[in-house]
Amino acid sequence: MVKSDGFVIGRRGALRVLGGMAAGLGVGASVQAQTTGGGGLGSSALQAVGRLFSRPQGNLLIVGGGDTPLSVQQRFVALAGGPENARIAVLPMASSQSDEEAQEVVRDLEGLGARAQVVEIRPTDVNSTAVAQTLEKFSGFWFSGGDQSRLSSLLVGTRALQAIEARYQAGAVVGGTSAGASVMSRLMLTGKWRTPRNSDEEEQVNIARGMKELAPGFGFFKGAIVDQHFMHRARYNRLISAVLDHPQLIGVGIDEETALLVRADGQWEVLGNYYVKIFDARRAQIVDDRGPMAKAADIRMHVLPEGGLFDPRRRRVEFQEVNIP
């Protein structure tokens, strides 16, 4: 087992900018720039961290898209009560054409011994007592892929979502893939640009504050912003841009065929075939401007394969040996 306590934390205060780059990253004439973020955490900040990373009774398992590995499906069923006991709702509302995918998920879960069924919640039923009572019977909830904005606009603030959250707080497992992963945070990336730049090329590569549109998500994954298909679609720019706008939140980039399990004990565990990348700017030095190019220093990045653990409270990483057949 290998442990990492992170890197050196920069001092609080103004960040010196040298030729347009942070001190230590370039050379040239210096000017002063205001920064956000900063050094050590005071008592109020520590209390805020405690609220952001408070522990629910349930587990959250989110996949970065692509094929969901069998080991991840097995873990989901186990967390929902195990074979014969797990009763799982498959919720396909992120897509208007997801019935076939949802039925495939049901077949996969049933093949692992769970009782699973598709639960399609219509806009007219989101505050229905009958729907809420139906949802209360499940021990697991799985959100399929599509467009996270469809899920957010349909369910946020509704009785249906409150019923799912109540089950989560009582010990149920909530999961999803692709859009069903992004929607789990309190603030979610919509995939849209808030401030388009001058060229398509610049939009693809820039890291800048104020660029990405965020919208309310479900709020099950507190203290984080999630992006999916991360390595396969080269989404570093949009997740880092969002983290610079909200440095109190940890950026979580999940690759395809890979999952992050947010455990009831507060630990984050990586499952699957590729990586979860974590961007932690809670103690970073960030230049407070909205120019076309971001300026920041001391952002921690962790690259975690299967078996990797992250403790968001203590900012610690552990790597565990994984047996590969």
Predicted regions and their residues:
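N-terminal secretory signal peptides
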Residues: 1-10, 17-23
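Boundary at the C-terminal end of the N-terminal hydrophobic targeting segment
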Residues: 31-33
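C-terminal and late-domain segments of enzyme folds
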Residues: 39-84, 99-111, 188-190, 194-325
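Short internal beta-strands
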Residues: 89-92
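Portal/gating segments that form or line small-molecule/metal binding sites
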Residues: 96-133, 137
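Catalytic-core regions built around general acid/base machinery
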Residues: 134, 157-171
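Catalytic nucleophile loop
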Residues: 144-145, 168-188
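Glycine/threonine-rich flexible loop motifs
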Residues: 148-157
